[in-house]
Amino acid sequence: IAHNICSSDGVRKGSIHSIEALSRTLLKLVNQTENSYSLNMGLFRVNLSDSHLTCTDGKGKIPIDGMITKNDYDLVRKTATAMSTPTNKLKLHTINKKFIINETFVVDDPIEMEAEVLESKVHIVTVSSASVRNIENCLKQSNLEVDDIVLNPIAKSNALLSQDDKDNGVCLID
């Protein structure tokens, strides 16, 4: 793993204030890192902090006739997230809370289970669409490609906690 440090030109108090300045900074940082470590960096995963983030819960329910398929799983999650999102917001993450089979059994993974009804409860994270577009514009102006944008606390938990830690309820305090 490589690392490098440079000034955060174009960013003030965690917000982008100049796309041009930040684009130059990103390009300089990538070039320094590639040269220092003999790397060719391609896709970038960006962790986002957003003071305008909101979290809501969603719930979806669909009828099932037999075994639950991946398509059923996708459809019930889509139904659970079918809330209207303001034009200035973007759904960044949908986090499964639980699946309920036949209004009785709570399961983590319903695929291939038999059911008449499948319900999904999810946690939906929305962020400022302008913040995301600004990040994408900075990277594009620097000829850098975005692979994914992840909310900062989720990125940290993915980097630091194992699946067992998460399953056992470990709390990461930032």
What are these regions (language model features)?
Residues 1-43, 48-173:
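Nucleotide/phosphate-binding catalytic cleft detector across ATP-hydrolyzing
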